[in-house]
Amino acid sequence: MVESVVKNWQGEQVGQKTFELRVAKETTAAHIVHRALVRQQTNARQGTASTKTRAEVRGGGRKPWRQKGTGRARAGSIRSPLWRGGGVIFGPKPRDFDLKMNRKERRLALRTALVSRIDDLILVEEFSNELSRPKTKDLVAAFTRWGAEPESKILLILSEFPENVYLSARNIENLKLIAADQLNVYDLLHADKIVVTTSALEKIQEVYNG
């Protein structure tokens, strides 16, 4: 059971909200979060790097000079890895870096990562109605009132993206918007401050507590 203060648009405390997210045991928490983080980063790799071996490089079928009598070192192909333009020894080949992780484990890692950041989590009321029109300056001022400095890395979690909020937020350099049902471990751990709306928190409990 976790309790967090709820702030309004002006940055004033207007109540408290209790929420419950099942997390990993203390002995295994770091391990499961680390596994989820490694999985996310490795799965983002393209794995398309490729080099040619001496068998794949064009040419080199003819022996460049006879074996003996020239005074030069013996050579069997101009595509030897020792030659410029030759094949590559043990170079990269296309491969699949994907790591498997059960959905239950992934969700457990997400919940554990989120709860571990409770000291940096700022819970706010819905504020889309406070922005009568898209205005980055107003949203930056709101973050400051909430205790999240605009220079810091901020993760803003919303249940949905109203156009005025999206347009106000997209030009803030260190801000990342994410939907409540699209969370990932890297963003939760990477942010300095995590700002969550009350409706987004309810959606997180609904989606990830299953």
Curated annotation (Swiss-Prot):
Pfam families: Ribosomal_L4
Annotated GO CC locations: ribonucleoprotein complex; ribosome
Superkingdom: Bacteria
The keyword NAD belongs to this UniProt entry's keyword annotation: no
Regions of compositional bias (Basic residues) in chain numbering: 60-71
Keywords: Ribonucleoprotein, Ribosomal protein, RNA-binding, rRNA-binding
Keyword Ribonucleoprotein: yes
Residue spans of biased composition, Polar residues class: 41-52
GO molecular function annotations of the record: rRNA binding; structural constituent of ribosome
Gene Ontology terms: biological process: translation
Ranges where the record places region Disordered: 41-71
NCBIfam families for this protein: rplD_bact
Family (UniProt): Belongs to the universal ribosomal protein uL4 family.
Subunit organization: Part of the 50S ribosomal subunit.
Function per UniProt: One of the primary rRNA binding proteins, this protein initially binds near the 5'-end of the 23S rRNA. It is important during the early stages of 50S assembly. It makes multiple contacts with different domains of the 23S rRNA in the assembled 50S subunit and ribosome.
Protein name per its UniProtKB record: Large ribosomal subunit protein uL4
Native organism taxonomy: Bacteria, Bacillati, Cyanobacteriota, Cyanophyceae, Nostocales
